Structure formats: structure tokens, C-alpha cells
Design a protein with these regions (language model features):
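Periplasmic/ER-lumenal interhelical loops and adjacent helix-loop junctions
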Residues: 108-114, 279-368, 490, 625-641, ...
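Membrane-embedded helix bundles of polyisoprenyl
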Residues: 157-165, 169, 175-270, 276-291, ...
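Active-site lumenal/periplasmic loops and adjacent helix-entry segments of GT-C-fold
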Residues: 79-210, 214, 222-231, 481
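Membrane-helix boundary/interfacial segments in multi-pass membrane proteins
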Residues: 92, 190-202, 343-347, 371-450, ...
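Aromatic-rich transmembrane-lumenal/periplasmic boundary elements in polytopic membrane proteins
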Residues: 68-120, 277-326, 506-512, 516-525
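Internal/C-terminal transmembrane anchor helices
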Residues: 62-70, 278-290, 447-477
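Start-transfer (signal-anchor) and selected internal transmembrane alpha helices
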Residues: 1, 7, 33-80, 659-676
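Extracytoplasmic
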Residues: 7, 440-441, 445-447, 468-676
């Protein structure tokens, strides 16, 4: 009480040291934030900067040489095709249709829920990979055929660089990174994707490793050059999201596996988990029409279109739906016979065995426990996807029901295996040693351990070189003739002029296979067009659903094959066709007789006029109606084009892509140096 009684009162004006105004508080917060941000940075000395600059030069020099080697290898392997692409022709193969479409037609097909591949057109979601082709065509200034050729020959160097970036997440060894990139690029040769011009799988090869590389960089799980430290990056997350768009657009079935992978990443990643949830958003918007159609008409089996792509599926390549084991699915996808005594099959068996053992070894490495388990999640999800896809029917052909391709899932598995192989190499960070410390430490156990580690990396590099040779040998041996070529032919010039005169002009191309079988295609360009290839339309065929126009065309073609029929010609004219082009196929005498019979029947029918005849075929103009009235009904297309849902999708996708692109733009950094 006595102390309290003796207290005195002091005016606040005399205690100004204990008070802070708003400006002082703001200054304190700014300095505190600056201090906290500097704690995660490394201040580099001039010698350290010189060390990093030297490492950057070595690293990128090796990457450029690797890319040039890949480009030269593909150009040499397919030199006749590479030489012919400059003539203006279109690529084609056993699985890839040629194209004669303009850039405007490509944009319309890529953004409008209407497919002209069946009859005179049906409502169906656009094939997502056309968005990738549309962007590639911008690089070639609107030349669609040049864009296809560019994708084929640029895919190898870009896929090598893509995996080189992913390998840099796990190891800084330049040799292992370069050999890993070459091994990933040679995987496309082994599967025959270059020989087939399999555009969807080449797209996956280019973008899938890069997408995962930026995912790891986004959450700060990557190795850097000494003395830098890894850090999280929103910019890397945005780039990863953009890289996943072409992957999902090329092979929508990968979406199922990627969803599971991202859910598992949320469990293993320590920080920035919310950022991971935003990575799949742009890809989901890009394939939104396909997803909505698959869910809305799931009871009609339209979900099966997710297991198809823009290539033409065949029973010989995909097989029939069956409950296969993982080894059987891999053998079907690769054309590999595990129990065979053929040297190529034996070499691939040894290759897969060695890669699997190295991937299993990565699970017990103490410095890569979390990362190795993440990549094994990718392996397991890819294998599960391959098993599911081989059980799903997506269309029918002359040999029966065709199953979905197991190749996307197997490719995802191989990506995980090769990533685990890079993990085995260790960090391999070249430590920076100041000049005064060089040579000051005597030899120790640590130095001897370093020699053993380097020797192990040399052995690993030799194994990777052997694997590259095996994959290239197998691909060249097994995929000698996949029908890859450049189509410089097409419809006659007079026919092409008629088609180009109006977007609603059509010509029916027919080819007699036997006396009882006739093939037909509705032509709106000079070639049977790639942009009209639709997985959704093929699912409709698999379930026996066909529009009235398609049924009428099939009936009329069958009647003209059997005999002259003026009513059939009148029906085709009524549907809007301006002519019939009879294709001469094969040099066989019996085949020529069948083709001549079909041509004679068309000539003998009323309302036809022989306009031009070449070695490739004969064009007949339909003269029943006036030229101005010869056009298909585009009412359904105009409704789909003006649909509110289409406009909403395009606007939403554009806004989302613009936002992610702004975040992904490179920024100038004052401190530090991010390492590729």
C-alpha cells in the first residue's frame, strides 16, 4: 500500500518513446517483412555467381546438343518424308488421316460442338486435340499441313528437353539428365509413334514430363546448384497447369490417372497444397465439352469417348476389349512378345527388367523417400489406366470391336520408371569451394565415398546408353512400315474449286472394296480430313446409332454398286452433294473390274456427268439441281455455333488461360538464380 500511495502521475507527452504512430508501425511491418523474405535467399559472392554461370553454360550446351541429335535422328530416319513436306503435301499414316483444311475450318471444328465426319454432320463435342493443332498452326502462320509436319519432327527434341527438365528435379548430373532425355525421346521410336505420326502420343511425350517438372518446382521439391536453395513458386504452378492442357487434350483418358496422382500429391507434399488444387483447372476447361457430353449421356455409353483420340483406332493396333494383366497390356501396346526368343523381344525384356530393378531401388534411398513414392504413384496410376483402357470398347471396324489404347497409361508408367532411375543417380550437386579452401582438406573417407558414388553414376550412365540403343533398335526393327508418307494427291482441281466455293458444298467419295462392300466418305476438303475425326462419333457407330443422312448415303452407295439407280443419285443430290468421286484403289485386275463396274453404274444413272477422269479416280457432277441449290443443310451447325453454352465455354476458357498466362510470365529477379 505504501508503494501504491507513493506513485506519481506522468503526462503522456513525456512518454513519447513508448508510443508509435501509424507511419512508424507501417515502417516496422515493412522492415520485418523484408527481413523474413531475405532469410530464404542466398546472397551470392562474385565467385559464386561465376560458378553458377559456368554451370549454366555447361548445362544448356549439353541440352542443345541433345536436342540437335534428336532432331537429326528423326530427320535421317524419315528423310523421304522430311524432304517431301516442303512440297505442300499433308502427312498421313495407317492411323493418321491427311488434311486439306484451312485454318478457318480448323478453328470452327476445334471450337464448335458439331462434327462433319458422319453424313452431313451430327451434334458432338469437338475433338480436344484440335485445340493443340490450332495453336501449332499459329506458329506456322495458319498452314495446317505444315503444323502437322512441325509436330512430327520437333517432337523428339522437345520431348528430350522436357524430360531433361524433369530429370533436373531429381539430379544435377548433366550426363544422367542428357541420357535420360535421349531415353525418353527414344521411347517414342520404340513404340513407333514417329513412324505412325501418332500426334496425340507425341504431344503427351512433349508436355507430360515438363508438366510434372513444374509441379515439383511449384512445391519446392527439387535440387538446385550449390549454394542456391529450392523454394516454392506460383509461377511454376501456372506453367505446370498450362503444360497439362495439351496432355489432357491429346489423351483425355489421362485425366482419370492425373486426378488420382494429384490427390496423392496432396498427402505427400508438405506445403502449398492449395496451389496444387488449381493446377488441373485449365485442362478441365479445355476438355469441358467432352466431359459434359460424357457425363450427360453416360447411360448411352458416351463416356467411352474419353478413351479415344483423334487417330483412327483399329483392331490390329488396339485389339479387342479383354481382361488383360499388366504384362499383357504392355505387350499389346508395344507389340512385344515376352516369351519370344527373338533378339529384339529378349532385349526389351532385359531392358524392362533392369529399369524396374532400378526403380525399386529408389524406394529405399534415404534421400529420396518422399519423391520416389510420388513417382511410384504415377507408375501405379499409369498401369491401372492401361488395364482399364484395354477393357473399354470405343468403336468397331471390319474385324470387330476395338478396345481403347493402353499406350497412354504405359507411357505414364515409363515416365515414372525413368524418373526413379534418375533418382538413383543422387543429387550430384557440384559443390562450390572458395579458392582459399581448395586443396586444404586431406583425403578422407568422405573422398573415397565420393569416388564410389561417381563410379556408380558412370555405371548408371552406361546402362542408360544400352537402354537407348535397345529402344532405337526395337523401334526401327518392328516399325519399318507404318504407312507414314506425304499425300500430295487429292480430289481433282475442279472438285476442289467447287468445295472451296462454299462452306456447305460437299462431294461423296466412294471406293469399291469387293462386289458386296463399298466404302464412302463425305468430302469437304481436297482430302479425307483429319479435323472430322471424332471419338464421340465412333462411339455412336459402336452402339449402332447412326443419323438418317448417313443411313441414306450407305443405302444409295450400295444400290449404285449393284446396278445403275437414278433414284439413288437423286437422293444424294437431295442431301446436298454436288458430285461423286470414284476412287481407283489397287492394281489388281479384279479390283479394277469392280471399280469399273461402279463407275459404269454411276454413268448409266440419270443426273450424272463425267467431268474428269485420272489414274487416281473419276469425278461425276450431279446435274439434277442447279449449282446454287447444291448444298447441305447447315441449320444444325448454325445452332451449335450460336449456342449460349459454346459462347460461355469459350469465354471461360479464354479468361482462365489469360489469367494463368499472366501468372506464368517470366519475371526479373534481383537476387539468386533459378536453375533449370
Amino acid at each position: 500500500r505504501s508503494l501504491v500511495a507513493r506513485q506519481s502521475k506522468v503526462a503522456a507527452s513525456s512518454l513519447h518513446v513508448l508510443f508509435a504512430d501509424s507511419q512508424q508501425i507501417k515502417q516496422f511491418h515493412d522492415r520485418r517483412d523484408a527481413f523474413q523474405s531475405q532469410q530464404g535467399r542466398v546472397l551470392l559472392s562474385p565467385l559464386e555467381r561465376a560458378h553458377l554461370r559456368t554451370r549454366t553454360i555447361y548445362r544448356w550446351s549439353a541440352a542443345v546438343v541433345m536436342a540437335l541429335v534428336c532432331f537429326a535422328a528423326i530427320a535421317v530416319m524419315y528423310w523421304p518424308v522430311f524432304r517431301s513436306i516442303f512440297s505442300g503435301g499433308s502427312l498421313y499414316s495407317d492411323v493418321l488421316l491427311p488434311t486439306g483444311a484451312s485454318f478457318t475450318q480448323l478453328v470452327q471444328s476445334a471450337t464448335t460442338p458439331w462434327v462433319f465426319g458422319s453424313g452431313t454432320g451430327i451434334p458432338a463435342p469437338p475433338t480436344p486435340w484440335l485445340l493443340v493443332l490450332m495453336l501449332a498452326s499459329l506458329v506456322t502462320l495458319g498452314h495446317v499441313t505444315a503444323a502437322l509436319a512441325m509436330i512430327l519432327f520437333v517432337a523428339a527434341p522437345l520431348s528430350a528437353l522436357s524430360f531433361w527438365a524433369l530429370a533436373g528435379v531429381f539430379t544435377r548430373s548433366d550426363v544422367v539428365r542428357v541420357l535420360g532425355g535421349l531415353l525418353w525421346a527414344s521411347t517414342g521410336i520404340m513404340f513407333g509413334w514417329y513412324a505412325q505420326a501418332n500426334m496425340p502420343m507425341l504431344t503427351v511425350m512433349v508436355f507430360l514430363p515438363a508438366a510434372f517438372a513444374f509441379v515439383f518446382r511449384a512445391v519446392g521439391m527439387y535440387h538446385t546448384e550449390d549454394p542456391l536453395k529450392p523454394r516454392t513458386s506460383v509461377q511454376a504452378a501456372a506453367i505446370a497447369a498450362l503444360c497439362f492442357i495439351p496432355v489432357v487434350a491429346a489423351e483425355p483418358q489421362l485425366l482419370f490417372a492425373l486426378i488420382v496422382v494429384f490427390l496423392m500429391f496432396l498427402l505427400f507434399v508438405r506445403r502449398k497444397r492449395a496451389m496444387l488444387l488449381l493446377i488441373p483447372v485449365p485442362a478441365a476447361f479445355a476438355v469441358a465439352p467432352t466431359l459434359v457430353n460424357a457425363v450427360r449421356y453416360a447411360d448411352l455409353g458416351m463416356w467411352r469417348q474419353l478413351f479415344g483420340d483423334i487417330t483412327v483406332p483399329t483392331s490390329s493396333a488396339n485389339g479387342s476389349p479383354a481382361s488383360l494383366s499388366l504384362l499383357e497390356a504392355a505387350q499389346r501396346a508395344l507389340g512385344w512378345r515376352m516369351g519370344s526368343t527373338d533378339y529384339a523381344d529378349l532385349a526389351v525384356t532385359v531392358l524392362f527388367g533392369v529399369i524396374t530393378l532400378l526403380a525399386l531401388a529408389s524406394l529405399v534411398l534415404p534421400f529420396a523417400l518422399r519423391t520416389s513414392r510420388l513417382m511410384w504413384v504415377v507408375i501405379v496410376c499409369g498401369g491401372a489406366l492401361a488395364l482399364v483402357s484395354s477393357r473399354v470398347a470405343i468403336t468397331v471396324d471390319a474385324d470387330g470391336v476395338v478396345a481403347g489404347s493402353a499406350q497412354p497409361g504405359i507411357a505414364m508408367m515409363i515416365l515414372g520408371f525413368l524418373a526413379c532411375v534418375c533418382l538413383v543417380a543422387g543429387g550430384a550437386v557440384k559443390r562450390f569451394q572458395p579458392l582459399h579452401a581448395s586443396g586444404s582438406d586431406p583425403a578422407s573417407k568422405k573422398d573415397r565415398l565420393h569416388v564410389l558414388i561417381v563410379s556408380g553414376r558412370v555405371v548408371l550412365a552406361l546402362i542408360l546408353v544400352c537402354c537407348i540403343g535397345i529402344q532405337c533398335m526395337y523401334g526401327i526393327e518392328r516399325h519399318k512400315d507404318a504407312g507414314l508418307g506425304v499425300s500430295e494427291n487429292g480430289l481433282p482441281m475442279v472438285t476442289t474449286d467447287y468445295l472451296e466455293a462454299g462452306a456447305d458444298h460437299r462431294v461423296l467419295a466412294v471406293s469399291a472394296e469387293t462386289r458386296n462392300i463399298v466404302n464412302y466418305a463425305v468430302m469437304r476438303t481436297s482430302r479425307g480430313d483429319l479435323i472430322d475425326s471424332s471419338p464421340a462419333q465412333r462411339v455412336e457407330v459402336a452402339f449402332g446409332r447412326s443419323d438418317d443422312a448417313n443411313k441414306a448415303i450407305a443405302k444409295d452407295c450400295a444400290q449404285l454398286l449393284s446396278n445403275a439407280d437414278s433414284d439413288a443419285v437423286a437422293d444424294l443430290s437431295e442431301l446436298g452433294f454436288g458430285g461423286i468421286y470414284v476412287v481407283r484403289s489397287g492394281e489388281d485386275k479384279a479390283q479394277k473390274e469392280i471399280t469399273d463396274q461402279l463407275s459404269s453404274n454411276i454413268s448409266a444413272s440419270d443426273g450424272t456427268q463425267n467431268v474428269v477422269s485420272t489414274d487416281a479416280g473419276t469425278y461425276y457432277r450431279l446435274t439434277i439441281q442447279d449449282t446454287a441449290k447444291q448444298h447441305i443443310d447447315r441449320k444444325g451447325y448454325r445452332q451449335a455455333e450460336s449456342s449460349v453454352w459454346r459462347q460461355a465455354w469459350l469465354w471461360c476458357m479464354g479468361i482462365v488461360l489469360a489469367a494463368y498466362c499472366l501468372v506464368a510470365l517470366p519475371r526479373m529477379r534481383r537476387h539468386g538464380q533459378e536453375e533449370a
